[in-house]
């Protein structure tokens, strides 16, 4: 009985492997649920944000969307970090951090929590 059940399970697995793959890959017919009934893929961001224009010869086109934060100078090659002075591209990418208390830890208070607790009172 055990061998018969095992043979049936193995046969079912082979049938599933051989039949399921072609079913998922076939072209769908109208009114039929098949493997080709998937949502339409989204268009590329290049087609959505920028119209195609001819580039002059010798100018490389960019594949970045218009909303990208990378400037055109950042795409130029620069020396590895830590060697020599930072290039203009690296300097353009540096961000400034506002001074003052850390709002995540001190909740905007000018005092640190340790100073507020140690008032010297008994």
Swiss-Prot record:
Location in the cell: Secreted
Source superkingdom: Eukaryota
UniProt keyword annotations, A-Z: Developmental protein, Differentiation, Secreted, Signal
Gene inactivation effect: Enlargement of the floral meristem and increased number of floral organs.
Signal keyword on record: yes
Compositionally biased residues, Basic residues: 54-63
Compositionally skewed regions (Low complexity) per UniProt: 64-77
BP GO terms, sorted: cell differentiation
Functional description taken from the UniProt entry: Probable extracellular signal that regulates meristem maintenance. May function as a putative ligand for a receptor complex including FON1. Regulates the size of the floral meristem and the number of floral organs.
Annotated protein name in UniProt: Protein FLORAL ORGAN NUMBER2
Native organism: Oryza sativa subsp. japonica
């Amino acid at each position: 009985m055990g061998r018969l059940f095992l043979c049936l399970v193995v046969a079912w697995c082979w049938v599933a492997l051989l039949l399921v793959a072609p079913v998922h890959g076939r072209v769908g017919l109208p009114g039929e649920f098949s493997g080709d009934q998937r949502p339409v893929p989204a268009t590329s961001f290049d087609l959505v944000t920028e119209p195609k224009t001819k580039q002059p010869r010798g100018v490389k086109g960019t594949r970045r969307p218009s909303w990208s934060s990378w400037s055109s100078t950042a795409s130029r090659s620069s020396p590895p970090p830590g060697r020599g002075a930072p290039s203009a591209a690296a300097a353009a990418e540096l961000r400034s951090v506002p001074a003052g208390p850390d709002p995540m830890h001190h909740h905007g208070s000018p005092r640190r929590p340790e100073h507020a607790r140690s008032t010297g009172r008994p």
